[in-house]
Amino acid sequence: STERQVSLTSGTGVCRALRQRGHQAILVDMFLGLESYTGRLADVFDAPDGLCGDNRVLSTEPDLEAVRRSRRDQGPSLLGKDVLAVCAMADLVFLALHGSCGEDGRIQATLDLLGVPYTGSGYLGSGMAMDKSVTKRIMDSAGIPTAPWHDVRYTREDIPRLAQELPVPCAVKIINGGSSIGVELPDTREELAQVPAGALSTAGT
């Protein structure tokens, strides 16, 4: 997802903190898996530095196409080499994933089916919370105060009309994104007219 680097940064921090406290912990890149690990899978939890690299949040979004091309296995699976195998070996999987696939219930459901314990919410809660429109509707139906919102589905041709119809100032966010990626805060209609095209690009729709 566009939050790939945020996930790696979070995972690195968690992994190193656990190792400092005496736990056998490793960082596993969900997409690339253990492609760069050359040891025996049975010994992976003894890997130096827990397979943590120099991961930090970047000021630019990751080039996801470049990431896809970098993986030796060019198959359609979003799970890299030995990811499920090493998860099954662990006592607990700490999910430090952000964004689609990591927070939307899909990886949670996969681990549920495999009987692998993990941290965080289950697949149903994750899926509902990741969709901002669903979350807003649930909060409304439960009488929980939430800021007014508009669920807008549009194409590029709709942008001029939306820029005139939607209230400003406002906050614009893709429906299934997190970590503030893709959030815009236009104060004027001119600024609002520039926002939806970028949101379309980030959301991929």
Feature names for model-found ranges:
Residues 141-180, 184:
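Rossmann-like NAD(P)H-binding beta-loop-alpha module
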Residues 146, 169, 181-205:
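Conserved ATP-binding module of the ATP-grasp superfamily
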Residues 1-124, 128-134, 141, 152-161:
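ATP-binding N-terminal substructure of ATP-dependent carboxylate-amine bond-forming enzymes
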Residues 93, 100-101, 167-169, 192:
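Short secondary-structure boundary micro-motifs
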Residues 47, 61, 75, 166-168, ...:
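Intrinsic-disorder/low-complexity coil detector
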Residues 91, 115, 167, 203-204:
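Residue-level detector of structured alpha->beta connecting loops
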Residues 21, 89, 165, 198-202:
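Alpha-helix C-cap/termination motif
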